A protein has these predicted regions:
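Structural beta-sheet core signal
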Residues: 4-6, 49, 101, 127-130
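Acidic helix N-cap motif at the loop->helix transition within catalytic regions
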Residues: 56-62
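Residue-level signal for inorganic ion chemistry
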Residues: 6, 32, 85, 102-103, ...
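Short, high-confidence coil segments that cap the C-terminus of an alpha-helix
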Residues: 44, 94-96, 124-127
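Acidic metal-phosphate-binding loop of nucleotide-sugar-dependent transferases
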Residues: 78, 104-108
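Conserved core of the sugar-phosphate nucleotidyltransferase
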Residues: 109-179
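N-terminal glycine-rich phosphate-binding loop and ensuing alpha1 helix
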Residues: 1-56, 68
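Short phosphate-binding loop-to-helix
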Residues: 63-98
Length: 179
């Protein structure tokens, strides 16, 4: 099966909205609901959302009515939140499941991208990371000068990123064990 982990455990302090960024609304719908809906429309049968501690009621309300969705409290860093979310998925899904890791702060991902990432993993890819061309001018800054970087060689990394659940969880457990 295809399952998803939506990372929404950030506090959103840089945004200055006074609530977690994932709960901010875009067109009357929270970012987290838009992101989870895209995962479901793209084929995810189960979705785990990592959330900040103490926000369980707010996230339950934001995600009300969406099928196959559960929330777990994330950790202090994104990597911790991903590991905790993967552990939750591993308790309910086989290790061979395709897991799509997605940032709640990217609510406009088309379900077609979700399906393409999942399909590539199902067809044998070990890891699938969608990228888009960089359109902005980028400068590499040194001590006393700077130069334009050839943007034709650059790509911006997007989510969801696809893997096999067991392999990604094992990598995260190893990283956590090594500190």
């Amino acid at each position: 099966p295809v399952v998803a982990l939506v990372v929404a455990a950030g506090s959103g302090s840089r945004l200055g909205a006074g609530l977690p960024k994932a709960l901010v609304e875009l067109g009357g719908v929270s970012l987290v609901r838009r992101s989870v809906s895209a995962m479901i429309e793209g084929g995810a049968k189960k979705v785990v959302v990592t959330i900040p501690s103490g926000t369980e009621a707010e996230f339950a309300a934001a995600l009300s009515g969406l099928p196959g969705v559960s929330c777990v409290v994330g950790g202090p860093q994104r990597q911790d939140s991903v590991r905790l979310g993967l552990k939750a998925l591993a308790r309910m899904c086989p290790a061979s499941s395709v897991v799509l890791v997605h940032d709640a702060a990217r609510p406009l991902v088309p379900p077609s991208v979700v399906r393409r990432v999942a399909s590539a993993v199902l067809e044998g890819a070990v890891a699938v990371i969608p990228v888009v061309p960089v359109h902005d001018t980028i400068r590499e800054v040194g001590e006393t000068d700077s130069q334009v970087v050839d943007r034709d060689r650059l790509r911006a990394v997007q989510t969801p990123q696809g893997f096999r659940l067991g392999a990604l969880l094992a990598a995260h457990e190893e990283a956590a064990a090594q500190g």
